[in-house]
């Protein structure tokens, strides 16, 4: 499917699986270290938004990288360990539910991305960011790439790291707050989660009070 130039500053057809072509285009311009950036947790009613930044070694790319949403949990876990072993540098950052409520989810996600890039052990020459927005305040130039986790292996790697990190956080949250089943749905608005919120009320610091159906109904 063709995309308009407004969709992304780097225009390609969507491949069957992400590849290294986006990074290679930048490397041809003399840019050496390219970071992929993605986040997990924009939509849930509970928990943080988590962002990851990954700089891959072009000579040792992990096989099987893909958008984290197209992988099973077991496959994500396996690739997560491979990415941490093979990547040049990996960084993760998160913003809490309180931080999300204090601003909004879009700003919080972009800030988490910015912090993830800053946390890398080397300064990347360029950042490829999943979505339509480049986080303000990056320490390097960046490009937004629509469906980037399905187009760039660096972004796909970041999507896996962010997703696995957040899922593990929500498993721990589920153990601390059993009625909500957070370890099952990771904070998303499932029927069980909504029913638990109705019966138990939301948990301050865990639930997002600016998200429906919590917004305006409960005091934080």
Swiss-Prot record:
Annotated positions binding a divalent metal cation: 38-39, 130
Keyword Metal-binding belongs to the record: yes
Cofactors, names only: Mn(2+); Mg(2+)
Record field: catalytic activity: Endonucleolytic cleavage to 5'-phosphomonoester
Residue span(s) of domain RNase H type-2: 32-220
UniProt cofactor note: Manganese or magnesium. Binds 1 divalent metal ion per monomer in the absence of substrate. May bind a second metal ion after substrate binding.
Entry superkingdom: Bacteria
PROSITE patterns per UniProt: RNASE_H_2 (PS51975)
Subcellular locations according to the entry: Cytoplasm
CDD domains per UniProt: RNase_HII_bacteria_HII_like
Alphabetized Pfam families for the sequence: RNase_HII
GO molecular function list: manganese ion binding; RNA binding; RNA-DNA hybrid ribonuclease activity
Example GO BP: mismatch repair
GO cellular component assignments: cytoplasm; ribonuclease H2 complex
Family stated for the protein in its record: Belongs to the RNase HII family.
NCBIfam families: PRK00015.1-3
Record function comment: Endonuclease that specifically degrades the RNA of RNA-DNA hybrids.
HAMAP family from the UniProt entry: RNase_HII_B
Protein name: Ribonuclease HII
